[in-house]
């Protein structure tokens, strides 16, 4: 069967369902596809098809995730749904599923539960920009006051984790009733998608961000100078642009790009996603190395101290068999290189077990170009023992 072409006519947004186990995340995902399928904007996926999430391995970590796609009048969506709580933790921290926004599903019959809180915290840790709430199972609650109470509790919880709890759209509905075709509840799904369309912001495209290219290799072309190669992570760069070489050294160096090539062909401009070689003016081979980045001057700084949220691999995932303690000194792998760093655990945390999710403070032995949101792997003896994301940079 020939593959269909992906038509890029609408903005693309990545979202996912989050919330406590059995509050109806997967049923809601199925209901969204059913309601939109009736408008010709999705392919209906039944609960069972989504629930049998295929097992994926992302950086050695086993994750079960279901990917569903659909569109509204305004946008094209890729939607992720995970069957188990551990899958969410791994998925969000390792960045296997980037979310531009999330639908938090809360059962009106139960109110917020422990994982409701954990998933809101996770969304905060990994920088999910916006959340819309779907109060599910409203057909089981006759008492208007009870619904208001649940809504109030969830809004307070969102405020606690620095989401604008008072502004977030709340949609009341029943995913199961919508699947059964009950018009009142089908309308609630339509309202939910309108809220997602309007409240979750369209992400800025990588091409529009400031230029950044991690350096993978450095070599000299006789008579021309030093060339660095790598894949452009974001932004654009033209011949003649000023760039800064950041990381690993005390001083960042500014230089000019005097030539760009891709697939052995010369070009004037490169952009996010391109694998390129950049010729740098007046830079000797020994002044630049793998692990540094080429960036728009002033757009990123080198740091040795940062805080991060990490997921620690289990031994089944190839991680450690034993816990680690305060002062643990593994390697931190950022973009293209490993740097040794020391881990400081939060107050009151004695040790970290395989399978845990924890916030850590790190001090690296060399400065690296880091910023909030950057993902990293924690490695020991060449194998990954944890996967994480920078939550804050200090100095």
From Swiss-Prot:
Keywords: Cytoplasm, Elongation factor, GTP-binding, Hydrolase, Magnesium, Metal-binding, Nucleotide-binding, Protein biosynthesis. Residues 60-64 are annotated as: G2. It is an enzyme of class 3 (hydrolase). GTP binds at residues 19-26, 81-85, 136-139. Residues 10-204 form the tr-type G domain. Residues 174-176 are annotated as: G5. The keyword Zinc-finger does not apply. Pfam families: GTP_EFTU, GTP_EFTU_D2, GTP_EFTU_D3. GO terms for molecular function: GTP binding; GTPase activity; translation elongation factor activity. Residues 19-26 are annotated as: G1. Residues 136-139 are annotated as: G4. It catalyses: GTP + H2O = GDP + phosphate + H(+). Its EC number is 3.6.5.3. CDD domains: EF_Tu, EFTU_II, EFTU_III. It is found in: Cytoplasm. Residues 81-84 are annotated as: G3. InterPro entries: EF-Tu_GTP-bd (IPR041709), EF-Tu_GTPase (IPR050055), EFTu-like_2 (IPR004161), EFTU_2 (IPR033720), G_TR_CS (IPR031157), P-loop_NTPase (IPR027417), Small_GTP-bd (IPR005225), T_Tr_GTP-bd_dom (IPR000795). Signal peptide: none annotated. Mg(2+) binds at residue 26. GO terms for cellular component: cytosol. GTP hydrolase that promotes the GTP-dependent binding of aminoacyl-tRNA to the A-site of ribosomes during protein biosynthesis. HAMAP family: EF_Tu_B (MF_00118_B). Monomer. Belongs to the TRAFAC class translation factor GTPase superfamily. Classic translation factor GTPase family. EF-Tu/EF-1A subfamily. This is Elongation factor Tu. It comes from Symbiobacterium thermophilum (strain DSM 24528 / JCM 14929 / IAM 14863 / T). The lineage of its organism: Bacteria, Bacillati, Bacillota, Clostridia, Eubacteriales. The gene is tuf.
């Amino acid at each position: 069967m020939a593959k269909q072409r992906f038509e890029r006519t609408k903005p693309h947004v990545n979202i996912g369902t989050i919330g406590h186990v059995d509050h109806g995340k997967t049923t809601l995902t199925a209901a969204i596809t059913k309601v939109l399928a009736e408008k010709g904007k999705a392919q209906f996926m039944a609960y069972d098809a989504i629930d049998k999430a295929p097992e994926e391995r992302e950086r050695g970590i086993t994750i079960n995730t279901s990917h569903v796609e659909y569109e509204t009048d305004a946008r094209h969506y890729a939607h992720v749904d995970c069957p188990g709580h551990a899958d969410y933790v791994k998925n969000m921290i390792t960045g296997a599923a980037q979310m531009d926004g999330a639908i938090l599903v809360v059962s009106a019959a139960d109110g917020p539960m422990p994982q409701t809180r954990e998933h809101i915290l996770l969304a905060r840790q990994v920088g999910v920009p916006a959340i819309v709430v779907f109060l599910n199972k409203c057909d089981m609650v006759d008492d208007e006051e009870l619904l208001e109470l649940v809504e109030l509790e969830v809004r307070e919880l969102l405020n606690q984790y620095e989401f604008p709890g008072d502004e977030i759209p709340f949609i009341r509905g029943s995913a199961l009733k919508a699947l059964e075709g009950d018009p009142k509840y089908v309308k609630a799904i339509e309202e939910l998608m309108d809220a997602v369309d309007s409240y979750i912001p369209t992400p800025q495209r990588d091409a529009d961000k400031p230029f950044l290219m991690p350096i993978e290799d450095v070599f000299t072309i006789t008579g021309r100078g030093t060339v660095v190669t790598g894949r452009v992570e974001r932004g654009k760069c033209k011949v003649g642009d000023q760039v800064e070489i950041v990381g690993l050294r005390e001083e960042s160096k500014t230089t000019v790009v005097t030539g760009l090539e891709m697939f052995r062909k010369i070009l004037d401009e490169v952009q996010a996603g391109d694998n390129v070689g950049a010729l740098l003016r007046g830079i000797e081979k020994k002044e630049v190395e793998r692990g540094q980045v080429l960036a728009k001057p002033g757009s990123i700084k080198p740091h040795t101290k940062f805080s991060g949220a990490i997921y620690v691999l289990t031994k089944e995932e190839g991680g450690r068999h034993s816990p680690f303690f305060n002062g643990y000194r593994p390697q931190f792998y950022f973009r293209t290189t490993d740097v040794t760093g020391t881990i400081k655990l939060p107050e009151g945390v004695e040790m970290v077990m395989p399978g845990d999710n924890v916030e850590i403070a790190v001090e690296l032995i060399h400065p690296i170009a880091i910023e909030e949101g950057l993902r990293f792997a924690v490695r020991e003896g060449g194998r990954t023992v944890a996967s994480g994301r920078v939550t804050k940079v200090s100095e």
